[in-house]
Amino acid sequence: KLCDVHSALFHGLTKEEKIANAEKAVEESLKKEETSEMTTMTDAYVRKHELAKALRETKGHPLYSFTEANEKFRKEIADIRGALEKGGDVSKKISDFRQIAIHYAQKGDLIYPLLKVRYEISGPSDVMWTVDDEIRDELAAIDKECNHDEEWMKRVQAVLTRADEMIYKETNILFPICAMNFTAEEWYGIYEDAKDYASVYGIENR
């Protein structure tokens, strides 16, 4: 079962071993569930999402850290929207929310190129990368704007919607694709390289 991933973590003495053990446990569990050489598209879809879910719940795995950051972003989006509805000042919250650019930089440096170059999966890099940049740039422009009129608030709501949609796409499209393709060695490389980035809302890249 994919839940065996969690027990596998306790066999490694280091985070590196934990990641490797988790990947091995997932791979073995999927092999056990194979009933034939050919699987239907539905089976592949389910397997892909089960694998991504297992890795997202594996402490120490890069997908766990990415998901933890996304949960924080989603909470901040809700807080900003709530403050706007009450007519509150969201300037500080907008400035803080720009930390999402760090998350986007990690994807742009560590995930998109690997998918496109090594696996020739260009969709995420061709589409999501552009949207990431647009969200980042719009947040920067909004943060610098002094006139917080109705038009400004509409722009805030619009960019929050796009950021929220990106979280959904990462969870349901990007992460499952990565989970089905990246090797344990590649995940370990992402884990190591992520240490070079600043933390997001205090969430360490561990």
Model-derived features: positions:
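Small-residue-biased structural context
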Residues: 1-101, 105-206
